[in-house]
Amino acid sequence: MKVTQEKLPRSQMGLNVEVEGEKSKQAYEKLVRDTMRTARIPGFRPGKAPRQLVLQFYGKERLRAQALENLIDSSLKEAIEQESIASLGNLQLRDSFEELLGRYQPGEPLSFKAAVDVQPEVQLGTYTGLTVRYSEVPYEAKQVDDQLEQYREQRAVLVPVEGRAAEVGDTAVIDFAGTKAADGNEIVGGKATDFEVELLPGRLIAGFTEGIIGMQIGESTELALRFPDDYPQQELAGVDAKFAVSLKDLKIKELPVLDDDFAGDISEFETLEALRAFLEQQQQEQAAEKTRANRDAAIIKALVAETTVDLPETLVNREVQFLAEQSFRNLQQQGIDPSRIFTEENMPRVRETLRVDAENRLKRTLALAQVARAENIVVEEEQVAARIVELRSELEEEVSEQALAEFAREEMLTEKILEWLAEHSTIELTLPGEAIEPGSGEDAPPEVAAGATEPEAQPNS
């Protein structure tokens, strides 16, 4: 079988295949024999009907079309193997099947054109001496105070409030029922009993918590409110509503004292001073990690700007599918029903967002891999083995050795490539908030699902 290749756009390899007459005949005869062997024709036992009757019963043109389809499929697989083409998939016939069927005569040669996706060629521009600017994430002592305050909030207990009206910061226990102002119909999910809400701005739709402030326990009121125009549940966006609210109880947070006893209760440290020292070191390490992440993102962005690659559709589609599944799992872990995001109406926009993210991720990955090949950057297996041991100590679930090895190898190789690029680039560290020129700044990780909604139509903001 004669095969000639030609490069096509989008990292496709064009194949011009010439099939010998004997092979075109074999494809047809094999199909006829197989059909005769399994044919069930009235008046004949399976496989006993004569050839002409089988051809007449199933239709000569139908059998010829099926034989051609089989011939094309087997010839393409043979051509890819014969030419040692690293196919990614997405085999496509470039000729019209109907036109080929008109030319196909069993026993006569047949030529056709096809295409297959292959690994893209990555062309690196100037990847040494990149000029990179990125911002520092500073450590601030206030972060430790904020974290300790969060711990106090988590250990806070609610105690009853008596003899005064509701104030900002109280936790109110209320009954409420919402109706639409226009027709008086109940708002689905807009009713609750013994509902606890902290009286802080922004906890519910504008005006709800504010309307409770000043109420006495046992009082009732009616709040005339409006759902925001960008409310997640579209049927309520911009809708005027009335909420009948009854204040049943008031509570206030009682925070634990910040002392050595508190430190011992929430950690392995015996003193508050030791806990503070640990948190300070932790915050400093996190700030350094974020600063490095900014550096890495800026390097990658500059590298991609110097890289040319024509992405094949197969790789893009695989990456889109991976991102979609990842987003689906992330939403579930956040307690959000993915079907509320991946709706039929939203899917075109979601797919477009995923596609852009997928192409960017692929370009980054391919560019880094090309640098590794060009500079012979590798990770020693001893290093991978040591990293696997570390990962196992951090993981709670059982993960296969192969999966851990692949993850560790990829993680460590990426780190080595970025360190090499950093050593061979001109890097400028900017102050927090200082403007960074387009093209040299940091890329935030792509987020797919935005505007996640609560399952109930309660007056949440």
From Swiss-Prot:
Domain PPIase FKBP-type: 169-256
Compartment(s) where it occurs, according to its Swiss-Prot or TrEMBL record: Cytoplasm
EC assignment: 5.2.1.8
Keywords, sorted A to Z: Cell cycle, Cell division, Chaperone, Cytoplasm, Isomerase, Rotamase
Protein family according to the UniProt entry: Belongs to the FKBP-type PPIase family. Tig subfamily.
The record's note on its domains: Consists of 3 domains; the N-terminus binds the ribosome, the middle domain has PPIase activity, while the C-terminus has intrinsic chaperone activity on its own.
Function: Involved in protein export. Acts as a chaperone by maintaining the newly synthesized protein in an open conformation. Functions as a peptidyl-prolyl cis-trans isomerase.
Protein name: Trigger factor
Gene (UniProt): tig
